[in-house]
Amino acid sequence: MNATPRIASLFDSLLEQKGSDLHMSVGYPPLGRIRGELVPLREAPLSVPEMESLLFELINPEQKRQITEDLDLDFAYGYGTKARFRANYFYKMTGLGAVFRTIPSKVLSLEDLKTPEVVRKLADRRSGLVLVTGPTGSGKSTTLAGMINYINHTRPAHVLTIEDPVEFVHESQKAQVTHREVGPHASSFATAIRSAGREDPNVILIGELRTNETMKLALQLASFGVLVFATVHTNSAPATIDRIINAFPAEEQGQVRGMLAESLAGIVAQQLLKTADGKGRVAALEILVGGSAIASMIREGKVFQIASKMQAGQGQGMQTLDMHLERLVKDNVVTPEAALEKAQDKENLAKVISRLKPDWEVPEALKSI
């Protein structure tokens, strides 16, 4: 469906300011997330009739039926040649609302994203489970798209993506890339993942591991010789491992530990921070690389030891989030305050920053940490 001038003006305003999200709520003006901050895109608040008119003009009759019956709708919207958006419609106390997340029209390469070499090595794997994790809006999809883009341009492989909705569209290069969307192409993630095993894939991207059923299916595929990429909403590598194991009943957790220990290739946990110059955002990455030592810790239930292993595993490309935050502060990419806001051990990082920058004073709000 074509955007009318009313909503097109909001999309254009967001894109001109390099915003990441458009928030629309009844009783408030449309808000854009610009460099991490929500700012009004116009002064006038949205009324109920205006909201429904603006949002319904973008969807087809089947989608209107879905939002009316399910009270929730996810879909991808192509705004001409300018951009794609991942849209979520939902109902709340004040009525219909929506969030549109910008999907860059160009798939950024790993070089564009300035990811460390170890991320490319994870994409070079021929099998195993690679998880990209972080909170909503931390750039997980962008990092995964960069890894798929790398595979697409470097080797002949069948790459299958299963998403809800499809975000980045990859045109086949050296690889054959097949996109499947939950809803139009499959009834559920689980159904699509089961079917994937019969579609001769070398690489599978699963938009999100939401249930223990999809987690187990992903682990099985990874152990069968497929390279599986997926996202999880967790803030660190150890928390990701715990999240997967704890998603299962106690009687199944031993088996899941074994499967995860065998198949885990790596975890990239990321956070987005505003840059020190205020002109953009940068990703801080925690990186875990699977291996015999990590596998033993997972099997033996010693996940609490993994952070220490990452600190000692720099030769393998491993790092904790705080290690990367320290480097970003040292290189003046981010401010000490921005780094401390995301740090896992705020007290320790504050001490490290004080040594790096003797003239820096810990803000009063942080002295009680």
Residue spans of the language-model regions?
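Short, flexible helix-loop junctions that flank or precede catalytic/ligand sites
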Residues: M1-I369
